[in-house]
Structure formats: structure tokens, C-alpha cells
Amino acid sequence: LSRAFERTYSYLQGGTRFSKSSQALRWVLGLEVQNSDLQGKIIGRNESIDNGFTNVLPSANLRYQFNQGSNVSVNYRTSTRDPSLNELQPFVDNTDPLRTYAGNPNLTPQYQHSLSADFRRFDQFTFRNVYAYANVGYNRNQIVQSRVIDAQGRQTVMPVNLGDGWNGNAGVNLTNGSLGITAHA
């Protein structure tokens, strides 16, 4: 089985951002369009891959300065993760008979939404500092590695689009002079 493969990958992205600033408030709104196209041909076989994807990627950023030592920020952005050539190639790699890998030409890009917020307050006279943050992410068409183990203990691994998924974290950091406390979740 030959793994010879010819490919052409093109990627275009363009967009615009609008921003406004005042002494206390700064905001930015953005919108981008992304187009990617992967065309490939398996040498010696009559098989090809032709995947093209277009995505709209909005973004927003807001920062408010309460005073010189305190501010809050909120950020939203979107991004994509295109499948790699290795993930898309319809080949079975059986160099390790206990763990075979098969590409998946039907993968679609993963689309990610990220929302984050943080608050900062610092008193320059007492050196007290408060920093708190929270992040949440939503992924559509997550690309994950599917593993199937047969009765003899052999693994077959293949990338698949899992569907939707969420993730998040939050934390706070409090400092009073030289003493600090940090908590993350």
C-alpha cells in the first residue's frame, strides 16, 4: 500500500475591526471570514480528497477602567481547527500491529467559541492585589481520537468529529503585601 499523496492547501482570511476608546472604556468589534481548501490525490489509486470550508469568525473585546488601579475586561473570540493532512488521508498505518491508525477524509473543521472575563484591582500604597478570572469555551465538531480495542487487545485509532463540548475554568489571586493566596478551578 503506497502512502504517496499529492496535495494543495490554500488558506485565505480577511476581515475588519471597529474600535472606540475613551478615558475609561475601550471596545473592539471584529468580523473575519476564513476560507480553507484542501485538495489531494493518492498516487497510484483513483482516490482524491476535496475539502473546502468557509467560516465567519466574530470577536469582541471590552475593557472598563474604574480608576488607575482597577479594571474589568470581557473578551469573546471564535477560531477554527482544520483537520491535518495526516488526519484526512484515507490510509491505514499498521506498522504497529497492536495499534493501527486510520485517517478519516470525512472530517470537518472544529469551530471554537471562547469567552473570558477578568477583574484586577491593585492598591499601590498597601500592595493589595485582587485578580479574578473566568473562562468558558464551546467547541462544535470537536476532532478527537476514537479508540476501539478488540478482544485480542489491539487498538484501532481514527480521528472523528465528536460533536459539541464545553470547557471552563476560573480562579482568584489575592495578595496582601508579601502574603498571597491563589485558588483555581
Where are these regions (language model features)?
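Transmembrane beta-barrel strands of outer-membrane/channel proteins
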Residues: 1, 14, 29-35, 62, ...
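Outer membrane beta-barrel strand-and-loop segments of large Gram-negative receptors
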Residues: 1-5, 102, 108, 127-185
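Transmembrane beta-barrel architecture of outer-membrane proteins
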Residues: 9-15, 53-59, 102, 112-116, ...
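Surface-exposed extracellular loop regions of Gram-negative outer-membrane beta-barrel proteins
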Residues: 9-48, 53-63, 69-113, 136-154, 160
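Outer-membrane beta-barrel channels and translocator barrels
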Residues: 22-25, 65-69, 112, 122-126, ...
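Gram-negative outer-membrane beta-barrel proteins
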Residues: 24-26, 35-43, 50-52, 80-86, ...
